[in-house]
Amino acid sequence: MTELDQFWPACLARLEAELSSQQFNTWIKPLTAEAGDEGIALFAPNRFIMQFIKDRFLPRIEELAVELVGELPVELRLGAPTARPAAPVAGNSQPKAKEPAKAAASAPAAPSPAKQAAVKAIGGSHESTRLNPSFTFDTLVTGKGNQLARAAAMQIAENPGDQAYNPLFVYGGVGLGKTHLIQAIGNHVFQKNPQAKIRYIHAERYVADIMRAYQHKAFDEFKRYYHSLDLLLIDDIQFFAGKNRTQEEFFYAFNALIEGGKQVIMTCDSYPKQIEGMEERLISRFSWGLTVEIQPPELEMRVAILMKKAEADSIKLEHNVAFFIAQNVRSNVRELEGALKRVVAYARFTSQNITLELVKEALKDILAAGNRQVTVDAIQKTVAEYYKIKLSDMHSKKRSRDIARPRQVAMALAKELTQLSLPNIGDAFGGRDHTTVLHACKTITEMRASDADIAHDYEALLSMLRN
């Protein structure tokens, strides 16, 4: 093995140690390398990843090249190596999958006449995807809250069955666009290959279908169908909790699809290890591929969502009006779009144009609820109870991590949920300087993107304080 051949495995090992598992699996792992006479070529599977690598990681890769083998030109290309693939990344506990099967799988055997009703009960036509055609990547507004999830989704849509992203587990609060995101994958795959066998299904419907299949003695057909899919998208998988028979059947379906190189995508309202009533063997498998979070949209993204929705529905919406709605409806995309629908309906019923005054009247109950501001005292008390520390620790000078981290979380929550300035927030935390508050907010924002536990804690506290 030449020095160039040894470079990429060594570089991968260094990057894996430096980056979070999400960053490494999403951006670095899909790359392949080919050593040439004068340097090394890195191949990205699509333009989106190639551009992201160029902007964020290529300088570090070039630094490692100099450090590991001396002066080494590194070239970034689109596609795949013509010679041999890069060395595999060690440490993946997932069983080796077969090569991703082409989506044009043969159709399952037709049910016997005696079981036609049962087949209909378990999902209707086998050709039906149950995808909403309006849920596409083009109609999905992207912001900091869903940037990583969208990037992973686009990669999967281009290369379904890729072991690094299989399964994809998307989690986050209610109404944040998880369903839109995973259906965008399904629609993209179907557009590329209409022969692909795709099924989108809500977890509750899957449970009901299993029960019907047993009642109608049609379980063989049910099993044959789900085991033969190219792409399975299951929404709100937390509904499997406590349903042992459903979990057992899904376990076998999951294994059959993954081992066949087929893609499985799931959404949930919480991180896999936080799901109560779910078998450990399933929770373990949920983490085989990539787990990504969707966070509540920031202000700029909320404005963009409103403007895009208004444009799609041919509604004249001024930017200042959208900004006002976005400022006052912060929880999730569903409530944001619901507020816009209420404004539009009010304008039509009263035959008025959509103005700031009309919005204030149409949303007066929402605005009244929003005006009941969360206080810093309430934030400190809630965070202290959540992390099981003393309330006085919020004001103390203690700097141990088990005290400092909850205090930083509380500062970040105070910045998001109150109208206080940074100096005022600092005063409420034992007279700290505004730069300390700013540092705390920045730290927590970065950790929410890289640490699943911190992200989960923050969202849980947000929900508790808002409700």
Swiss-Prot record:
Region (Domain I, interacts with DnaA modulators): 1-79
GO molecular function: ATP binding; ATP hydrolysis activity; DNA replication origin binding; lipid binding
Biased composition (Low complexity): 102-121
Annotated segments matching region Domain II: 79-129
Segments of this protein annotated with the region Domain IV, binds dsDNA: 348-467
GO annotations of cellular component type: cytoplasm; plasma membrane
Region annotation (Disordered) ranges: 84-126
Record keyword ATP-binding present: yes
SMART domains: AAA, Bac_DnaA_C
Binding residue positions for ATP: 175, 177-179
SUPFAM superfamilies given in the database record: P-loop containing nucleoside triphosphate hydrolases (SSF52540), TrpR-like (SSF48295)
UniProt keyword terms in alphabetical order: ATP-binding, Cytoplasm, DNA replication, DNA-binding, Lipid-binding, Nucleotide-binding
Single Gene Ontology BP annotation: regulation of DNA replication
Subcellular location, record wording: Cytoplasm
Entry-linked Pfam families: Bac_DnaA, Bac_DnaA_C, DnaA_N
Region of interest called Domain III, AAA+ region, as start-end residue ranges on this chain: 130-347
Its job: Plays an essential role in the initiation and regulation of chromosomal replication. ATP-DnaA binds to the origin of replication (oriC) to initiate formation of the DNA replication initiation complex once per cell cycle. Binds the DnaA box (a 9 base pair repeat at the origin) and separates the double-stranded (ds)DNA. Forms a right-handed helical filament on oriC DNA; dsDNA binds to the exterior of the filament while single-stranded (ss)DNA is stabiized in the filament's interior.
Quaternary state and interactors: Oligomerizes as a right-handed, spiral filament on DNA at oriC.
NCBIfam families registered for this protein in UniProt: DnaA
Record comment regarding domains: Domain I is involved in oligomerization and binding regulators, domain II is flexibile and of varying length in different bacteria, domain III forms the AAA+ region, while domain IV binds dsDNA.
Family per record: Belongs to the DnaA family.
Name by which UniProt lists this protein: Chromosomal replication initiator protein DnaA
Organism listed in the record: Chromobacterium violaceum (strain ATCC 12472 / DSM 30191 / JCM 1249 / CCUG 213 / NBRC 12614 / NCIMB 9131 / NCTC 9757 / MK)
Encoding gene (name): dnaA
